[in-house]
């Protein structure tokens, strides 16, 4: 009898442990959101019909020479895409080389995937744009009211190095377009200049993924680190911090330029861009 009681107690204890582990697994996305990863952002209800937005991404798909697969961080593309399209904005996808946009595989895996990512996977129109993105050389930037640059590790290899992208961003700025970026997407500003030929970011309040977050994630082999490069170019870099910067969040605006710190900033960045556009009308 005593042995049976002990066995029942052990069994109940093990069941309790398993139930606790299962609950933690189920609740992990919610816990991460509570800590600051992909926080819920209450979108404004805009109707910006007859306006156009361009989302620009990387075309680079590997970390280093023959390293792990990478690309654009999915939510940094999908969240702004649906924020814009739900406001009745026509949205195009472009990339440095055109064609199929590489997506960071880890950004589509549990528990990092978002509702916008899941929506995009089922959206045939989005998937067609993703697989047939417009080459940046072929873009007529004058057609767009909003220009947004998504991040991801791949962006460290081609956004900041593209003179063509720099020319497009320079022209967009000169034409009073609203330009935004999140995370590594801010590297797309590096080749852009103002009307005097100075670095466009010089003296501007900007944010992007921090050196601290890059070091914490241990992916330091990428050629350009946004915080370092923006500071070198003369930007007034600002950011928030957390016990791990992957849980931090910050969005800043300087005139028509809106920048978000990391993947947590996508919704707020897109909404602030739309607010600026709405205020122009």
What are these model-predicted stretches?
Residues 178:
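Active-site cofactor/cluster-binding pocket
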Residues 2-175, 187-281:
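Extended, subdomain-level signal for the structured scaffold at the beginning of enzyme domains
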Residues 181-186:
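Short, thiol/selenol-centered motifs that function as redox-active sites or metal-ligating centers
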